[in-house]
Amino acid sequence: MELWNVSTSDLDGWVAATLQPSTDFSAAVKKTVRQICDFLKETCFEDEIRVFKTVKVRAATPIPLQDPVLQGLGLSARSPFPSPQGGSAGKGTALRNNSDADVVIFLSCFSSYVEQREEHPKILKFIENRLQECRQRLSFTVSISPPRYKGRSLSLTLSSNGESIEVDVLPTYDALGQVTQDGPPDPQVYVDLLDVNSSPGEFSTCFTELQKKFVKRCPAKLKNLLRLVKHWYKQILKPQYPGAELPPKYALELLTIYTWEQGANSNEAFNMAEGFCTVLKLLGQYRDICIYWERYYSLQHHRIGAHLKQLLRMPCPIILDPADPTGILGQGKRWDLVAKEAARCCASMRCITGVQPWNVQPAKPVTLEVRGLQGDRLRITVSPSTTIWQLKEEISKNWGIPPCQQRLSQQPAGTPLILHNDKSLASYGIYYDTTLVLLRTEPQEMEIFVKDIKNQTMTYSVRPTDTVLQLKKKINSRQGIPVEQQRLTYDSRNLEDQRTLQHYNVQPKSTIYLLLRLRGGARPQHPGCPSS
């Protein structure tokens, strides 16, 4: 049965029966990959090169190169790096009939990120020659194909009983050393990475073990949701847009994990259809997506945090690799096509028809600490989509300071950055807990526009604390229209004489509409303005 025809109640069973790989195939794949790993560790290399360890994990996906050093090695600007952009056998999210894995080998001949960059071609050629010997020892049919990532990997296809798995062999620098627990490594590992000015995700294979742990910790049902999203990506999205530069599967994996954490509160007992529906709905909000974790690196670290904050100021969607602080996923890809297909599926896919998605925002809430000049402090948790004016309204509720008398600033290194009312926190890259400084000011004059029934516009200088009646008197003084004949509207609301302009949230450069109350006749109606 195709996914399109699966009912909501049958979705869990369909995923288990259709997408989970067979037990026999999984066991055979593990055995075969283990044989390849054993060969690489015990037979392949001469005594001067040691294999520290091998890791079976997920497939790689190309990303563009921009590093001039790498271009100098003969790689084109579109050459791909093997980066952690899929999910599969090593993480427990493999699909039935067709899946993928990386065999990452950590070699003693790479003593730094730079050496990995420089020595890769020679090592790959050596492994390719030696790997031919392994083919006769395997119970699987093995074919060695041209590498999907030229100059970065060896590509194998293992087949048995109609099921196959693609394997990439990836020689890598052992940046982490012995990984014994699921915790953050020494921050110096990431500082050294930043020092080599790598392209996004260039050395992501160095952090394979952390990427694997991040996904493998997920409960079984979440892994089935990951399988479902991957199936949608491979069998529905990609055939719809063959050849399109779509974002990598790994980005959708991370979005799915984020969705579960936020929408199901990391609970193992969740509704599969609701989770799937929520992921598709979030894909439609890709322009607002900003996702990151601080499991293995921290924004609090001076050097790493500064780099991460630069990434968080980039255009959305922003999805950061939880194990590699240089890995920003899916930039420049066709998220619009993903959103279009997600919307089509939400409207017509039987398993999510009528399903209510979880209440998940495309970016995590942030906690702001607002500091007054007298030492007062206020903590507010809001969405990054909150505008500065809305934030000022929240501050006003707590401290009683009118929004028009508040000036908020960020305090990055150097000159303070004044935050403007009409912009959102997200527009300033505030996707993380931040401290803002509040200065109380006297209401400043601002220019507003008054447009009459003839579409003629005049500019007036007012203060937010001016009343509507005071504005009417200014109109009377300039245009000769009696106050009692004026009817003013703003944002589809009639303005009452005793209220202030700030009460109606009148901003600089706002347009207020002027209508005339005619004696003994009908009142003219300005387009877009309500009747009294």
Identify what each model region corresponds to:
Residues 1-45, 71, 132-138, 170-179, ...:
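Long, low-complexity, Ser/Thr/Gly/Pro-rich intrinsically disordered segments that act as flexible linkers
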Residues 1-99, 105-124, 146-153, 194:
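N-terminal regions immediately upstream of nucleotidyltransferase
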Residues 27, 31-34, 38, 99-102, ...:
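Amphipathic alpha-helical interface elements that mediate macromolecular binding in regulatory proteins
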Residues 28-37, 41, 46, 50, ...:
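Catalytic cores of NTP-dependent nucleotidyl/adenyl transfer enzymes across multiple folds
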Residues 50-70, 77-89, 122, 141-154, ...:
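Short amphipathic alpha-helical segments embedded in low-complexity Lys/Glu-rich regions
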Residues 245-249, 253-364:
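Pol beta-like nucleotidyltransferase catalytic core
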